[in-house]
Every structure is written in structure tokens, then in C-alpha cells.
């Protein structure tokens, strides 16, 4: 490049890329980094470069809780269990799978509500389906919330049904906050969602998400075992110090 400086390019999503100029960008990049194994492999296929690295550079840290007791009391006057979903209302996040799973769960266990955080192109259709299925009392669309991490304190389970994730920052946040997780393993989720840390769903079917969520809601002992291991994983592998060390090593090697 004209500036004659070393360039490191980190890609944190896992969407397929296209175009001549996009490929050209990578030709003039000294080192390419993918945030997960899936992102790394996508970059290798697109760039035809074998030197693509993987650094999972989403750092998590403890934050101050915002007290949301009053909001929770209004949303959940029956003090039921809360299934949290933090995902945009877009096709790849599969909100209709969430909806179907929660409908099935409610037929077995009505002692919960579901709070779905996120906005997107499917918002109106989701609203219509919730009303059409009579789910408005227990499936609540929360829209986009700036203070989303404060809501994690009130979750009994986090549900993730996404078709494709670069890594899955909401999963890492749940691990740090010791919230039990039910998730698939699509894309970068495979790097962080494993049987010792979460309830893993392999089929992508609403029935499986329902079953695994019900298991966690009814088994606090199992939830405790999973969240303890998940917490140890995230503080070790996703601290700022650990990620900084990996990039520091990369920069040193690049500048030799």
C-alpha cells in the first residue's frame, strides 16, 4: 500500500463476502484474523490464503448493574421464571423458532415468561404471530435496549437459536453473569457452546429448544454445574488481558 505500513484486518462476522474490490482489500493486508473457527474458515475460502489466524477477541468484563426491579415487577407480576432472548428480529436469528419453542414450552409449563430483546425487519410479523397464537401474556417483545447487560441479572435461562454467528457475544455475557444457556452451534457458536458449559441443541428444531429450556428451568443443580464451568471458561479465554496478549504476539511477529 502507498502508506507502506503493516495492516492487520480482523473480521468479527461470518457472512459470505463477494466482489473484486473486497478480494483486493485482503491482498494488501499483511495479516487476516477471524473471530472464530467458522469466520476463519470463511476467510480462508474467500481469500485463498492459508495464513488466516483465529483470535476470539470479544472481551467481557464485570459491569455495574442497573436496578430494574420496578420494570421486572410490571412485566412479571407473577414472579415467574424468565427466559431471555437477545437477538435481532431477522431471518438468520430465527425468531419464529424461538416463538414455536416457547409455545411448546408453555403447553408443558406455564410458570415462565419470555423477554425477547432486539429489533429488526420481522418485528411486525412477530407481533402478529404472538397475538394470533395468544402468547402476548408470556412472550414480550422488548425492542432494542441500551442497557441490555443489566437485564441478564433477571434471566433464568438465555436462549439462542441463530443460524449464523461470528462468535456469539450474548452467550459470553450470559457465561459471565452465570445465566444458564440453551443454544445451537451454528457458525462461531461451535467454539463457545459445548456440553460442559451449556445445553446444546443440534437439530435446530423448536422441540429440542423447548426440551432443553425446560430441563434447565426445572434443574437448578444442573444449571449450577454448567454456569460454573462456563464462568471459568469466559474469564480465562475472554479477558482483556488474554486477548491483548494474543494480539501483542501477532504484532511482534509481524514487525520482526
Each language-model region and where it sits:
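A conserved, positively charged/aromatic
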Residues: 7-34, 47
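Acidic anion/phosphate-binding donor-loop and adjacent secondary structure
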Residues: 20, 41-45, 58-79, 150
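Aromatic "clamp/platform" in nucleotide-sugar-dependent glycosyltransferases that forms part
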Residues: 144, 163
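A conserved mid-protein helix/loop that constitutes part of the nucleotide-sugar donor-binding site
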Residues: 81, 85-107, 121-127, 169-172, ...
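Conserved acidic donor-binding segment of nucleotide-sugar-dependent glycosyltransferases
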Residues: 195-206, 215-220
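Short hydrophobic beta-strand element within catalytic cores of glycosyltransferases
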Residues: 180-183
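Nucleotide-activated donor-binding/catalytic signature segment of Leloir-type glycosyltransferases, i.e.
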Residues: 127-143
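A short, well-ordered alpha-helix in the C-terminal region of glycosyltransferases
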Residues: 208, 215, 222-237, 243-249
Amino acid at each position: 500500500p502507498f502508506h507502506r505500513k503493516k495492516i492487520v484486518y480482523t473480521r468479527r462476522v461470518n457472512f459470505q463476502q463477494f466482489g473484486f474490490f473486497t478480494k483486493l482489500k485482503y491482498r494488501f493486508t499483511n495479516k487476516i484474523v477471524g473471530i472464530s473457527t467458522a469466520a476463519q474458515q470463511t476467510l480462508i475460502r474467500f481469500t485463498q490464503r492459508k495464513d488466516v489466524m483465529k483470535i476470539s477477541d470479544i472481551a467481557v468484563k464485570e459491569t455495574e448493574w442497573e436496578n430494574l426491579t420496578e420494570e421486572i415487577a410490571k412485566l412479571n407480576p407473577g414472579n415467574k421464571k424468565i427466559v431471555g432472548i437477545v437477538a435481532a428480529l431477522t431471518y438468520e436469528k430465527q425468531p419464529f423458532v424461538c416463538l414455536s419453542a416457547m409455545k411448546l414450552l408453555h403447553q408443558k409449563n406455564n410458570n415462565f415468561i419470555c423477554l425477547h430483546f432486539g429489533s429488526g425487519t420481522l418485528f411486525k410479523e412477530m407481533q402478529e404471530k404472538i397475538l394470533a397464537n395468544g402468547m402476548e401474556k408470556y412472550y414480550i417483545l422488548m425492542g432494542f435496549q441500551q442497557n441490555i447487560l443489566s437485564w441478564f441479572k433477571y434471566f433464568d435461562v438465555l436462549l439462542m437459536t441463530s443460524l449464523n454467528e461470528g462468535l456469539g457475544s450474548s452467550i459470553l455475557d450470559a457465561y459471565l453473569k452465570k445465566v444458564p444457556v440453551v443454544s445451537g452451534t451454528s457458525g462461531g457458536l461451535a467454539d463457545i457452546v459445548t456440553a460442559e458449559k451449556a445445553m446444546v441443541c443440534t437439530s435446530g428444531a423448536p422441540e429440542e429448544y423447548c426440551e432443553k429450556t425446560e430441563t434447565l428451568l426445572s434443574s437448578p443443580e444442573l444449571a449450577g454445574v454448567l454456569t460454573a464451568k462456563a464462568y471459568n471458561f469466559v474469564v480465562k479465554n475472554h479477558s482483556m488481558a488474554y486477548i491483548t496478549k494474543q494480539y501483542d504476539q501477532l504484532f511482534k511477529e509481524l514487525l520482526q
